Amino acid sequence: MKKLGVVEGFYGSLMSFSQRNSIVESLSNNNLNFYLYAPKEDPFIRKHIDLDHSKEWEEQFQNFCHNANEKHIQISAGLCPKTNDYGSLANKINKFKSLGCNHFAILFDDTEDYD
């Protein structure tokens, strides 16, 4: 099945979960099926992949995934780890899986900033 949708992968202010859920609603209304969560300003999926989001964020993300799943929208997480930080990457993947996100992209853009 083709994946057609949006990538949240830009620099700038992070979107709220209300905004993300509105996008999921729009995707569903337009027969699209994919949302990649990969904002450049989220340090917990990039430079500080070894740290966890807040419990409140995790609860909101879990609800976001549930909402998307009900609308047949696949949520994927784009992770941009330090190139040698495999343990933290594995832990982050497991954390996202526990929140209902089971699809991932490993991104290597901007990794030179991690020195």
Language-model features, listed with the residues they occupy:
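Feature activates predominantly on carbohydrate-active enzymes
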Residues: 1-85, 89-92, 98-102, 107-109
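Active-site cleft segment of glycoside hydrolase catalytic domains centered on the general acid/base Glu
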Residues: 110-115
